[in-house]
Amino acid sequence: MTIKSWTVSDELWAKVEPLIPAQKREQQREYLREPGGGRKPLDRRKVFEGIVYVLRTGCQWKALPEERFGSASSIHKYFLAWQRAGVFVQLWRKGLAEYDAMEGIAWAWQSIDGSMVKAPLAQEAVGPNPTDRGKNGSKRSLLVDANGIPLSIVASGANVHDVKLLEPTLDQIVVKRPPVQAPLTEALCADNGYAGQPAKQAIELRNYVPNVRGRRDENVEKRNEPGKRARRWVVERTHSWLNRYRKLLVRFEKKLVSFEGLLELACALIVFRRVTVIYG
């Protein structure tokens, strides 16, 4: 029997469930209905599976199979509420903690790069895509460790230069970075989009050793040192992992909060695939 990639395993649900906020009533208000009355709330696990279903398949929220997951509009409301409560970034953080405990976050070689996607309906963090004839697009700036595990992600308009996203991406690592002492031991790999003195200063200010290489430089190094591979490719591979979540291939979310929620959940699932079985 084929396991569907949106069927959440018991192992993953055990990580998610404690993060979901309980529904609370305001102390100062008086309610006509007693607690527990009214329509029965949706099963939280089914709600989470519905969110993963949308993320994996790329379908519209209103196209969710109601017979499997329940009300599509309710699931979307839960998604927004959980995003505002920080559920997805907490899940990502928990995954990184388990990954660190299991084999250690590979801080020594980190890589950063941006990737652009179409965003025809976006109203926030959107701009003309210079590689798509000026059509609306968004960019995600991604930082990964040496194994391609995502550490930070920032969304912006497609017309924002990678260098302008360098500092926000480095400053928004979702777990605490270990203190770095001299001599510096953590390298940051990037392509020529991050060349120049301002980027170099920003990298060094955060105690990284800049390792900025263009493809031409990498080709020369490969000829001189056969068998040597560029370390920057790992971030490009992680961008391709993100693209397997089809809801991220084209951004249809109007609001930034929705887009960020999908990005954070995708990053969390990528991390957990490293440490446990997530589909079941």
Report the location of each language-model feature.
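Short alpha-helical elements
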Residues: M1-G280
